[in-house]
């Protein structure tokens, strides 16, 4: 599979998974994973960004992603990025930060960056505080290549 084909598959999956979902401002949720993916500088970052919320926010599974041709190293990264409802947010962030998985750390940084931008634009103070704190925690692990 070519890089372009993989990106197209990820885009199709994300679009189907988030169909009909709206964010806090009433905009289609798909705009967020698209923005996160487009911050990526390589195919793995783009695909992971597009798919980073799919399992957490839909009925899709990691097995389904593998069946669709998403490479196992990306699916493993998505497992790491998926926040279990039984896990505190701090534990979740620590798990990503200390994983040594650069793709997960970069994608989470992009996710937080876009969430922070949306929070500021929408005047969502609680979200801005949460995402600022999370970026402050993650910053030492994210060394901008």
For the regions a protein language model found, what residue spans apply to each?
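Active-site helical microenvironments for divalent-metal-assisted chemistry
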Residues: 1-145
């Amino acid at each position: 599979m070519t890089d372009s084909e993989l990106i197209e598959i990820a885009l199709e999956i994300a679009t189907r998974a988030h169909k009909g979902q709206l964010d806090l401002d009433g905009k289609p949720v798909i705009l967020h994973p698209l923005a996160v993916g487009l911050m990526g500088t390589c195919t793995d970052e783009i695909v992971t960004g597009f798919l980073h919320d799919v399992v957490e926010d839909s009925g899709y599974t990691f097995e389904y992603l593998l069946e669709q041709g998403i490479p196992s190293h990306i699916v493993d990264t998505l497992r790491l990025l998926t926040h279990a409802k039984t896990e505190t947010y701090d534990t979740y962030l620590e798990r990503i930060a200390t994983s040594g998985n650069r793709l997960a750390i970069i994608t989470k940084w992009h996710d937080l960056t876009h969430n922070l931008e949306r929070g500021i634009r929408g005047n969502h103070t609680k979200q801005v505080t949460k995402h600022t704190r999370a970026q402050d925690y993650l910053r030492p692990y994210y060394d901008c290549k």
